[in-house]
Structure formats: structure tokens, C-alpha cells
A protein has these predicted regions:
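Short catalytic-loop micro-motif centered on adjacent basic/acidic residues
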Residues: 15-20
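Gly-rich Lys/Arg/Thr-decorated short loops/hinges at beta-loop-alpha junctions or inter-strand turns
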Residues: 9-14, 109
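Active-site glycine- and acidic-residue-rich loops that bind
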Residues: 21-29
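Short, amphipathic C-terminal "tail helix"
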Residues: 133-157
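Short, small-residue-biased leader/transition segments that mark boundaries at the very start
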Residues: 3-4
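Glycine/aspartate-rich loop-and-adjacent alpha/beta segment that forms the canonical ThDP
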Residues: 30-126, 130, 143-144, 157
Length: 157
């Protein structure tokens, strides 16, 4: 799923959005409307907690969990609209703020991750660190990609 957005975006002719309705309902609705109106292939990738995630707070708190996922940097909200490039604008819109919540606390809020800590604490700590670094690197890469797509003056189509 993490490569899916970038792969679709790289083709240059696919509308693609990554959403989480609990984190930002307006962004989700905007993405759905844009995808529907796009005259070409559209792809919406949605973060949706399920019972297998083992939310410690309970499934009735899944909307809150989506916010945590975005705020921690586990899931980024973004849209890529090829029409914007044709209009001389940046086609990549990042709709989530820079992560500002504890990433590992987010992971530990789900049994699917927290159970590893009980079985092998040292290995879990290493994997949590790697996952957090990967999330930070993904966000930095996303910012770099957005910056690289900024239209250059005088080059608008």
C-alpha cells in the first residue's frame, strides 16, 4: 500500500489519493469528488482500521485511531491530480501536517504490534525504531517529491 500511491503517481495520468475519513472527512470527500470527476483512471487508498488490528481502545474508537495514525505519521493524507500539472500547478497536494505525535505509542495502541513486545521486547524495540525511521523517511521523501513537482516559472502548459 505504501508503494501503491507512488506507483500510480509516477504514471502521470492516474488520479490517486490517500485518505482516512476519521482523520479528515473534508479531505476524503474532496478526494472522492476529484476522483469521480477525473476523466481517466482514479485510485483512492483509504486507511480503515479493522478488528484484526486489535485496537486497544476498541473498534468504536476507530475514527480517533485514524487521526492518531495521521498525526503520528503512520498514514499520510495526500492527493495527486494530473489536471493540476496541465494547469501549471503542483499536482501533488499533501493534506496532512508534519507528524507531531509519538509514532511508537500509536503502534503500541494496536494488539497486532503490541503483542510482539510481550513475546520479544528487544526485537520489538528494534522493529519499532525501524518502522518509525521508515515513516519519517517516507514523509521526507514525500515533501521532496512535492517540491520537485513545483512548476517552474515560465514553464506552465
Amino acid at each position: 500500500r505504501r508503494v501503491l500511491f507512488r506507483s500510480a503517481m509516477t504514471s502521470g495520468h492516474v488520479y490517486v489519493a490517500q485518505v482516512a475519513i476519521g482523520a479528515n472527512p473534508a479531505q476524503t470527500l474532496k478526494a472522492l469528488r476529484e476522483a469521480e470527476s477525473y476523466d481517466g483512471p482514479s485510485l483512492i487508498i483509504a486507511y480503515a482500521p479493522c478488528i484484526n488490528h486489535g485496537l486497544k481502545a476498541g473498534m468504536n474508537r476507530s475514527m480517533v485511531e485514524m487521526k492518531k495514525a495521521v498525526r503520528a505519521g503512520y498514514w499520510n493524507l495526500m492527493r495527486f491530480d494530473p489536471r493540476l500539472a496541465e494547469a501549471g500547478k503542483n499536482p501533488l497536494q499533501i493534506d496532512s501536517a508534519k507528524p507531531n505525535e509519538d509514532y511508537q505509542s500509536f503502534l503500541k495502541g494496536e494488539v497486532r504490534y503490541a503483542s510482539l513486545t510481550m513475546k520479544n521486547p528487544a526485537h520489538a524495540a528494534m522493529l519499532y525504531e525501524e518502522s518509525e525511521k521508515s515513516a519519517k523517511d517516507r514523509y521526507d521523501s514525500l515533501i521532496q517529491k512535492r517540491n520537485s513537482l513545483e512548476p517552474k516559472e515560465g514553464l506552465a502548459k
